[in-house]
Amino acid sequence: MVMNVRVLTPTRVICSTTADEVILPGLTGLVGILDGHAALITALDTGLLRIKLNEKWTPIILCGGLAEIDRNRVTVLVNDVEELVAVELNEATTELEKATLAVENAETSKARLDASIELKKAVARLEGMNYLS
C-alpha cells in the first residue's frame, strides 16, 4: 500500500504524490517513514527530503519546517524549498567548502547561524546529486 505525500510552503503546494517510502531530515537525524507508520509530528531541519515511488527516489531540499504523519498520509510543511538542479561535482564541492569556511569564520551568532543553514543546504545539494542520475 502507498502513502499520500504532500509538501507545502506558506505560498504554494510543492508536490502532492504517492510514495512507498519517505525519508525526512529531522532535527536529530533522518526519519524513515513506511506505510502504516505510527502517528507522529516532528520538526524538520534544513536538509534533503527523499520520496521513493516504484524504486525511484525524488529529492527535495527543505529549509526547515515540520511533518505530520497520520496513517498513510505524510504532510510536510516547510518554510521554503530549494530547487535541486544538476551541477558539476566540483561546483557542489566548492560550495560546500565555502559554506564550511563561512561557519568557521563567522564573527557573530547570527552570522554563524546563517552560515550553518547555508552549510546544511550545501550538504543537501551534494547528497541530492546522487538521486539525479
Swiss-Prot record:
Keywords, alphabetical: ATP synthesis, CF(1), Chloroplast, Hydrogen ion transport, Ion transport, Membrane, Plastid, Thylakoid, Transport
Q: Where in the cell is it found?
A: Plastid, Chloroplast thylakoid membrane
List the InterPro entries hit by this protein, alphabetically.
ATP_synth_F1_dsu/esu, ATP_synth_F1_dsu/esu_N, ATPsynth_dsu/esu_N
Q: Quote the cellular component terms of the Gene Ontology held in the record.
A: chloroplast thylakoid membrane; proton-transporting ATP synthase complex
Residue ranges crossing the lipid bilayer per the database entry:
none
Molecular-function annotations in GO: ATP binding; proton-transporting ATP synthase activity, rotational mechanism
Regarding the membrane, this protein is recorded as: Peripheral membrane protein
Q: Which CDD domains match?
A: F1-ATPase_delta
Family recorded in the similarity comment: Belongs to the ATPase epsilon chain family.
Describe the protein's quaternary organization and the partners it interacts with: F-type ATPases have 2 components, CF(1) - the catalytic core - and CF(0) - the membrane proton channel. CF(1) has five subunits: alpha(3), beta(3), gamma(1), delta(1), epsilon(1). CF(0) has three main subunits: a, b and c.
Reported function = Produces ATP from ADP in the presence of a proton gradient across the membrane.
Q: What is this protein called?
A: ATP synthase epsilon chain, chloroplastic
- UniProt organism field: Trieres chinensis (Marine centric diatom)
